[in-house]
Regions:
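Bacterial N-terminal signal peptides that target proteins for export
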Residues: 1-9
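Hydrophobic h-region of N-terminal signal peptides that target proteins for export
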Residues: 12-21
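Short N-terminal segments immediately surrounding and downstream of signal-peptide cleavage
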Residues: 23-42
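Peptidyl-prolyl cis-trans isomerase
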Residues: 24-27, 59-212
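A short N-terminal beta->alpha junction/helix N-cap motif
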Residues: 31-32, 53, 57, 81
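Short amphipathic alpha-helical segments enriched in leucine
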Residues: 32, 46-49, 70, 74
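Short, conserved catalytic-motif segment at the N-terminal edge
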Residues: 45-60
C-alpha cells in the first residue's frame, strides 16, 4: 500500500510533467515531507520568481529558485497565520509579471513549458504568502538613529555619488531615503538570519543529481 508521501509524490510528478512536457522531471528536494520538482525549479527560475537580492551574475538561476522554494516551504510551515491570498491578488501578481517581462517574452516562456498564464498562480500564491509571512513577523518599526543616517551619508552616500558622477544632495534632502535604506538592509539581515535558523531545524533532503 502506498504511503501518503508516496501518493503525494506521484501526484505531484504527474501534474508537473503534464504542465512541463519539455522538462525531464525529477524530485530536486523534499522539505518537511513536501516535494519540489525540477519543473517547479525551472519555472520559478525562468520567470524570475526566485532571484534573491545580491545574487551573483553568471550563477545558475535554478539554484536561487530552489533556495527560494525551500525557504517558502519552511517559512509557511511555521507561519500558520498566513494562509490566505485572494484570487484578485494572485491575478494582479500575474498581470504584473506579464507586464514586467513583456507580452512577447511572457508568451515565449509559457510556450516553453506548455503552460497557460493561470498555471503560474500556485507559484505566485506561494511567493505572496511568503512575503506576507515575513512582513507580518518583521512588521515592527526598526529604529534608525540620526547618527546612523549621518554616518551613512558621509561614508556611503557621498562616495557612491562621487564615483558615479552624480549630484551629491544635501543631507536634509536624502535623509529619509537613507533612513529607509538602512531600515531595509537591517530587516533583510534579520529575515535572513531567521530563515537560516528555520533551515537548521527543518528536514531538507536535496537531490543534487536532479539539477545536473
Amino acid at each position: 500500500m502506498m504511503t501518503i508521501l508516496q501518493r503525494t509524490l506521484l501526484s505531484a510528478l504527474v501534474a508537473a510533467a503534464a504542465a512541463s512536457a519539455q522538462t525531464v522531471n525529477c524530485v530536486v528536494a523534499v522539505v518537511n515531507g513536501q516535494i519540489i520538482t525540477l519543473a517547479d525549479v525551472e519555472v520559478v527560475a525562468a520567470f524570475g520568481l526566485g532571484d534573491p537580492p545580491g545574487a551573483e551574475a553568471g550563477t545558475d538561476p535554478r539554484h536561487a529558485a530552489l533556495d527560494t522554494l525551500i525557504d517558502q516551504k519552511i517559512v509557511l510551515d511555521v507561519a500558520r497565520e498566513t494562509r490566505a491570498v485572494s484570487k484578485a491578488d494572485v491575478a494582479a501578481a500575474r498581470l504584473d509579471l506579464a507586464r514586467r517581462l513583456g507580452d512577447k517574452e511572457f508568451g515565449t516562456k509559457l510556450a516553453r513549458f506548455g503552460l497557460r498564464p493561470q498555471d503560474l498562480d500556485p507559484y505566485l500564491e506561494g511567493r505572496l504568502l511568503f512575503e506576507r509571512a515575513l512582513a507580518l513577523r518583521f512588521s515592527s518599526t526598526i529604529p534608525v538613529s540620526v547618527t546612523e543616517v549621518e554616518r551613512h551619508y558621509r561614508d556611503i552616500y557621498v562616495p557612491e555619488q562621487t564615483r558615479a558622477g552624480g549630484p551629491v544632495q544635501p543631507l536634509d534632502k536624502v535623509a529619509e531615503t537613507i533612513e529607509a535604506r538602512i531600515r531595509g538592509e537591517r530587516r533583510a539581515a534579520q529575515t535572513g538570519s531567521w530563515v537560516r535558523d528555520l533551515r537548521k531545524s527543518a528536514d531538507i533532503q536535496i537531490k543534487k543529481d536532479c539539477l545536473k
